[in-house]
Amino acid sequence: MKTRRLGPFEVSAIGLGCMNLSHAYGEPPSPEQGERILLKALELGVTLIDTAALYGFGANETLVGRVLKPYRSQIVLCSKGGMAGVEFPDGVKRVIDGRPEALRRNCEDSLRRLQTECIDLYYLHRWDKKVPIEDSVGALSELVRAGKIRSIGLSEVSAATLHRAHAVHPIVAVQSEYSLWTRNPEIAVLDACRSLGAALVAFSPDRKSTRLNSSHTDISRMPSSA
């Protein structure tokens, strides 16, 4: 597996986005299948593992933490806060909350579920526009100083927002959808990443498989290298 530089880390060029193990597009795999997928990814040389508090309303991080705890030193573990499931009388709903106290709570919950003392790369999942980006990133900077996270990333932000955030604390990565169909990062974000030394971490390079002719569910057919 080829590698790339991601902030202070050397990671596999292809990472495993874990969202679909418990959340979002189509029927998620069983926990047993999810475990097999995670272990197969490690076998194939994947070292970049990406999850979030939102995915499965915590179930995704719990699965990743349980399965990958024995391999913690072999991976760069990424998660996200600022968007999570919140309990309401009519069920759990997605809430964007970038207040410092919410981010601290999200991080502590993620550390517990992931069974780790520190998250390598912690993204602000979405910018809460009711909260200045400087306040949200300032809270994440405090988590770096406290040893809870090692580095900070942003997800789905504009170039202008990236520059504002980077002025508070170095941003090592911007996660954004990028594919043949979705080219939004080319509108200034790629240039901003280059100028600031931040990596662009592209998700859904196959546009969530919505334009593919078939889906692949047999992990025994996954290629051994990339």
Predicted regions and their residues:
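Active-site mouth loops of central-metabolism enzymes
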Residues: 20-32, 89-104, 125, 130
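Conserved small/polar residues in nucleotide/adenosyl-binding loops
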Residues: 210-214, 226
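Generic structural signal for well-ordered alpha-helices
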Residues: 1, 38, 61, 65, ...
